[in-house]
Each structure stands twice: as C-alpha cells, then as structure tokens.
A protein has these predicted regions:
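A general beta-strand register signal
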Residues: 7, 415, 560, 714-716
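Secreted/periplasmic carbohydrate-active enzymes, especially glycoside hydrolases
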Residues: 1-57, 66, 70-74, 132-133, ...
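Extracytoplasmic/secreted cell-surface and envelope-processing proteins
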Residues: 62-63, 83-85, 143-145, 462-463, ...
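Catalytic beta-strand/loop cores that center a nucleophilic Ser/Cys/Thr
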Residues: 469-470, 486-579, 595-622
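Substrate-binding/catalytic cleft of secreted carbohydrate-active enzymes
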Residues: 39-47, 51-308
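Compositionally biased, intrinsically disordered or flexible polar/acidic segments
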Residues: 619-768
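Short alpha-beta junction capping motif
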Residues: 438-485, 563, 569, 587
Length: 768
C-alpha cells in the first residue's frame, strides 16, 4: 500500500466494494458451491465492483475459488463484538445479545478462539490470490486494541502477502495497513454529500490519513418493498415481517401504491449513491468505498437497502450499465457548484476523469449539454492524457443560459471517445418570472383569514411548512431514513423520499420526475400531513412513509373547502431560492386555470386540527448551532462568584429536546468575572438521546486563568487527547455514531493530565 491507495502489482487501485452480511434466506447457511459464488461475483463485476467485505465472517473456500476466477478481491473477518452487545437492554429486549459477550482482551473464550481462527484462515485460504485483506472484525468498540494489535503483528510476520487491519470503524492503530471507517478520529467523516452541487470532495479529511482509508458502509438507503416479493421466501426464512407490514399498508389504504413508492424511493437511492461515489472518486487520497449494500438484508428487523433483493435479483431500480457510469475503473466526472440555475447565469463546470485502470488513455473527452428532447445546447471536446492511477483534470466549460425561455431539465453528458466510459448529470434552468397578479389568497396559517376566504368561495394557497402537530404530521427530509427503524428507532426522519404526480397540471411550470430529484433538495424543509382517514384524497406529492409505519402522507394536495378551493403546500415557498420561486409560480399558475377544480371535500374543523400552529421559542446560540437538540451554557444561572455543587438548575439550556435530559458528575461549578464552567479533575457527562441517531457533540473547554490545561477525553470508550490549551478556549468536536445512541444515551468522560482540572463552559449536540 501507498499512503493513500491499495496497490495491486504496484498499481493504485480504487477499491469499489460491497458488504456480504451472511444472508442466505432460502437455506440459512452460505453456499459451498463454486458456481453459485461465481454467479454472485459476476453480479459484482457487472456493477463495476472489484471487492467484497465479508462483514464479521469468513466465507467457505468455494467463495475464494470463485473470486480467483472472476477477479474479486476479498476482505475476510472473524466476528463482531461491540460495547452495546455487552449490556442488558431492558427497554429493548430484542437488542440484548445472548451471553452478553465482552470485548476481545476481556473475554477468555473469544481470546482463545479469535487468534486461532485467524491462523486457520490464512493456513486454509492464504494461497488464494483473491484473499487480499484480513480484518479481525466489525466495530470492535469494547475490545483491547493493544492485545488485538499483537495478534495482527504476528500474522503480518508469518504471512505478509495481504493487508491487515485490526477493526473497522473504531480506532486506527500502528499495525493497521489500511482502514475501513466512516470517521477518521479527530479528523472527520469519510463520506457524505456536502454542498448543493458536485463541486465537492473529502480531500481535507482523507489527506490527513497515513494509510489507505476505505469509506465504511456507504449508503444504507432503504427502498419501499414490492409486496409480491413475499412469495419468494420459500425456504428457511419466512417473510412474516413483510406480511405484517403489508397489513398496515392495507389498513391505511396504500397497499396498491407499492410500485409507485418502490420506483420513487429507488430512484432517490440511485441519485444518492451516484453522488456519494462520485464525491469519493473526486477525492485523490480516498482508497475506495464499501457499500451497505447492493442487496437487501432481512436481519435486524429488515433493512431493504439494496437495488437487488435478498436473492440477488434486480428490483428494477438501476441496470448494471447505468451503475457502471460512476462505478468503474475509469469514470468521467463533472464539478459544478449547484444543480439549479437561472437564465441570467452562466453554467460552469470542470471536467475530470478518474482513471484507475492499468492504461493511460490518449483520446478526446467530449461533453454535451442537451435538453430533455435531445436538442443540443452546446458541446466541447478536449484531448489530454488520462493518466492511470489518478484523478485527471481535463477541461472547463461555460454555457450562456440566456437564450433559454422556459423552465427545463438539461443533461450534461461526458464521454471518452472510442470507449464505453460515459457519465451524465441533470441540471435545472429557470427563467425569471413575475408572480401572476391574482386574487388568490396566499397565507401561512389556517386562521380566520383563510377560513373567511374559503367560505366566500375564494382560492387559497396555504404555505403549510410550519403547520401541524406531531400526531398528524411528519417533517420533510430529502434523504431517506437510515438503514431500518427496527434497528435504529429514534430517527425523526420516517420517510423514503416522495412520489410525485409529475403529469399533474400543478407542475406545468415546474419540470419534475416522479421522485424527488436534486432540485427538490433546496426546498425540502417543511411538513407532510397524515391523511389515513382520507382514502379518496389523491396527493399531488405524496412522501413515502417508512414501510414500518405505512402512513398515507401528503405534502402538496388540493381540496374543496366550504365554497372555496384550497391548495396546500408543505414545502417552504418563501425561501430565497430559484426552486422555491419556480414552484410557487407553477402552483399559482395552475390555480388561475379552469382545471383547478378539486373534487374532494374536507371540513374546516378537520383542517383546523390538521394545520395547527405552534409558535417557535426564540433561542440565542452561536452561529452554526441553531440545529442543536441540546445546547447548554454550563452554570450560567449561578449568581454568586465562587464554586457550587453541580445541579441542572444552575445551567442554562438554550435548546433542549424533550428527550435530551442530562446529568453531570464534576467537582463543582465555578464562576468568576470571566464566566462560568463545570470543573473537575475527572468529569462524566451523561446525555439521554433519541435512540439510534447520529451527530456531533461539541464541547467548549476553557483555560481563562492560564493553567495550561490538558487532558484525555473518552466518548463511549473512544479516547482522544485535549492538547495544552495555553490559556485559550477550545471547541472539541466528537463524532457520535448510531451505535453510541442505540441505548438512548451517550457518555463523555474527561480526565485531567495537566493544569489541575478541566473546565467546560458550553456543550452542544447536533443531530445529523
């Protein structure tokens, strides 16, 4: 390996992988048939993948033999033990692991088995060229890394033919030759889509690593199921869970919409995977990615996150040819800073090519910009050497958009001439419009103004993004929920994108597909409303409810109210955004037409309950912390200078989600003319959280009396160093994983190394 890449025959390779989670629903055990593994690995290759991570298990020899033949690299492992498996979960008994296994180094039976099993693995399969990576196991958070490092060093000395790592996603040790993780300690996350376009990467994070880092468990975007898949479970595993979920869909009158929801959530998954993978390909120091996963997983409740089902059959979401556009040895890339443009702007983009093949290409790279009918707007071509093993800068383009007169979707295509390598991106272009002068009432509350207008037979556009209560509405999100609410039940996001009636005349001036493509991301702030009691109401935009819930939802819908006509929009139309303005224009344009004639009636009293308004409390927090679910000014309510025992009544909680209670063990609270802080040689902060959420804990350490404070921090057992503060304040950002909050709490411990004690003046938890 080099500093940032895994080398095969001394050539940098971008690792494109998928997780195999030991899931065989027909038999209940892994196949030992070479042909079956050849079938599976041929599917890998068809989607442009080159390796597999066997999550916490080692496959039989048939898999290694098939991988040798097909050309797939293997990462094999032994087990998975994390801290949450070692505790009794009274509130969630299904999460209590049998035997409550302790971590390696603290578990005599496992401490004997694991090094022996590692040795057996390399003795049995070590001669297979596909066996390129070995890791002890998955997320070994409560294990002794010093002891595990000794095991790995012994293997490296005995058989240096492959790369070795101790654990995924917890801690990087000196013996690690590569790392699979979603977070580099004290540095940042290894994947995610930042920004509103494609002009982004994660080089600022990966460049700080000193070994190749592969993004861990990328994706985990669920797709709504097709109920006829239940019939495929004819073996060891019965789909009783899906049968139960289907009955909930029947109850709420949405069973027949499964294909629409499947297509819409699947299309959203596709653009998100494309965005994530290209972001990593644009990152020169990234070693690759491992997806979770291309297939559904029927464990942990069920995580229907694949574009293939649990039987390796296509779900009709994306073809191998389409996926290889951005998952291949050679991938054309485009950098532009936003997806939505106005006609008084110039569309600009940078063209790159990631080439991780074994050949330098010298051939023209061609780009075109076309509309949805294929009409060419502009094109260009440039020939530069596309060097192997790097991301190549190829060309830049500028397209004047001023001749476009109507809103439209446009395609940027980049093709490497004479090769199969091609990629495509969508952008949306909107001309400037003055809102139509109408007598339509536009209002953001369902109050006497709206009711009076409807009773008089007027038309009303209700901008409802701030309306609704918890029991009759749900927040809107662009991305789907994570993995599965069976396993991570505390998520506030309970949707999988939205199905859009794209042919509806409300969208005549707002080009859209039948799913939420990138232009919707700008405005996906607001509410959708639960309409289970309205089976005959057909939403214009229907968010896809998590199949564990199966509510019938509506974020844009129309109805007849008294003598009037009401169009409801749960998206924020008041944003300073071309997308918000264009959608508002399109809705108003529709409302001026004769075909705005809703037939479904809803009573005023019903709408009063649906559109209840709760004023937001005003908060004062530093910029960047507005979205905290907990923000504490430590000891701010203390009146007199000096020290006092900690009590929550002396803190000031600027923001506090009702689920985020906390307690602090410290020496005291201190107050002087410089401020207030929790202080202690050793402190413990325990924060209750919604279960299964992910985020960042920000802690502000003080040293205003110049004691050169320094210490050791431990968040859920992961240690980091607080360096000498030298009299300065210091914000520390600590990554919180979903597994950390799966027991409904996080625990931060601090230990003073220098300066007498540590001081914490503010603490904030921001949920991602």
């Amino acid at each position: 390996a080099s500093r940032s890449k895994i080398l095969i025959n001394n050539r940098p390779v971008f690792m494109r992988g998928n997780l195999d989670c030991l899931h065989f629903p027909l038999t209940g055990y892994p196949s030992c048939d070479i042909q079956e593994w050849e079938r599976i690995f041929s599917i890998y290759k068809s989607y442009g993948l080159n390796h597999v991570r066997f999550h916490s298990w080692c496959p039989p020899e048939a898999a290694f033999t098939a991988a040798d033949r097909i050309g797939i690299y293997i990462q094999a492992e032994v087990l998975w033990i994390d801290w949450w498996m070692s505790v009794v979960r009274k509130e969630r008994p299904e999460m209590t692991t049998r035997g409550l296994p302790k971590g390696l180094g603290h578990n005599p039976s496992a401490d004997k088995f694991v090094p022996e099993e590692l040795q057996r693995m390399i003795e049995a399969y070590g001669n297979h060229p596909s066996f390129t990576m070995l890791c002890i196991g998955n997320e070994l958070g409560n294990s002794n890394f010093d002891i595990m490092q000794q095991w790995i060093k012994s293997l490296q000395e005995k058989d240096p033919r492959r790369l070795y790592a101790i654990s995924t996603a917890r801690k990087i040790m000196p013996a690690d030759q590569y790392m699979v993780t979603h977070n580099i300690p004290q540095t940042g996350g290894t994947y995610g889509i930042n920004g509103s376009g494609t002009d982004n990467d994660r080089e600022s994070i990966y460049s700080k690593a000193t070994i190749p880092v592969i993004a861990h468990e990328v994706g985990q975007y669920p797709v709504y199921p097709l109920w006829n898949e239940i019939d495929k479970y004819t073996g060891a595993l019965e789909a009783r869970n899906l049968e139960s979920l289907r009955q909930q869909a029947v109850k709420n009158h949405i069973e027949h919409q499964d294909r629409k929801f499947h297509e819409a959530s699947g299309a959203l998954q596709t653009i998100l995977y494309k965005g994530l993978i290209e972001n990593l390909l644009r990152t020169p120091s990234c070693a690759g990615f491992q997806m979770l996963s291309m297939t559904d997983y029927s464990g942990q409740g069920e995580a229907l996150v694949g574009w293939l089902d649990s039987f390796w059959d296509s779900k009709g979401i994306i073809t191998p040819e389409q996926f290889r556009c951005y998952s291949n040895d050679i991938v054309p890339l485009a950098r532009f800073h936003k997806y939505t443009w106005q006609t008084d702007e110039t569309f600009k983009a940078q063209i790159q090519v990631a080439n991780y093949s074994d050949t330098t290409l010298i051939t023209p790279t061609i780009w075109t910009l076309t509309d949805e009918t294929g009409k060419l707007q502009q094109q260009g071509s440039r020939e530069v050497p596309l060097s192997s093993g790097k991301v190549n800068q190829v060309d830049s383009l500028s397209v004047d958009l001023s001749e476009i007169t109507s809103p439209g979707k446009y395609y940027l295509d980049v093709t490497i001439s004479g090769t199969p390598y091609h990629n495509r991106w969508s952008i949306w272009v909107y001309p400037p419009y003055n809102m139509p002068q109408t007598n339509i009432i536009i209002h953001d509350k369902f109050d006497s103004t709206v009711i009076s207008a409807l009773e008089q037979g007027k038309k009303v556009l209700l901008v409802a993004d701030q309306l609704g209560k918890k029991d009759n509405s749900t927040p809107l999100y662009f991305t789907p929920l994570f993995w599965s609410t069976s396993f991570f039940p505390g998520q506030s996001n309970t949707t999988l994108g939205a199905w859009i009636d794209k042919a509806h005349p409300a969208f005549s001036q707002f080009p859209t597909d039948n799913y939420t493509d990138w232009q919707w991301k700008e405005i996906t702030q607001g509410r959708s409303f639960i309409i289970n009691e309205h089976p005959q109401l057909h939403p214009i935009v229907q968010p896809v409810s998590d199949f564990h819930i199966n509510d019938k939802l509506a974020s844009i819908f129309e109805c007849k109210v008294s003598k009037g006509k009401l169009l409801v929009c749960g998206y924020n139309l008041n944003l300073d955004s071309p997308v918000a303005r264009q959608l508002k224009y399109s809705l108003l344009h529709y409302m001026t037409q004769s075909n705005f004639n809703p037939s479904y009636s809803i009573k005023i009293d019903t709408l009063k309950k649906m559109f209840a308004y709760t004023p937001k409390a005003m908060v004062s927090v530093p910029k960047g912390f507005e979205n905290s679910i907990l923000y504490i000014s430590c000891g701010k309510q203390m009146k007199n200078s000096g020290s006092a025992p900690w009590t929550a009544t002396l803190d000031h909680t600027e923001i506090q989600d009702e689920r985020c209670k906390y307690k602090v063990t410290c020496d005291n609270i201190w107050k002087d003319e410089k401020g207030t802080a929790w202080t202690g040689k050793n402190m413990t902060i325990e924060i209750q959280t919604p279960e299964g959420i992910i985020g960042d804990l920000y802690v502000k350490f003080e040293d205003w009396n110049h004691q050169n404070r320094a210490g050791l921090l431990s968040i859920e057992g992961r240690e980091s160093i607080l360096e000498n503060q030298k009299g300065k304040e210091r914000w520390v950002k600590l990554f919180i994983m979903r597994e950390d909050t799966n027991d409904g709490k996080i625990v931060l411990k601090t230990h003073t190394k220098q300066g007498g004690n540590l001081m914490i003046s503010q603490i904030a938890f921001i949920k991602q």
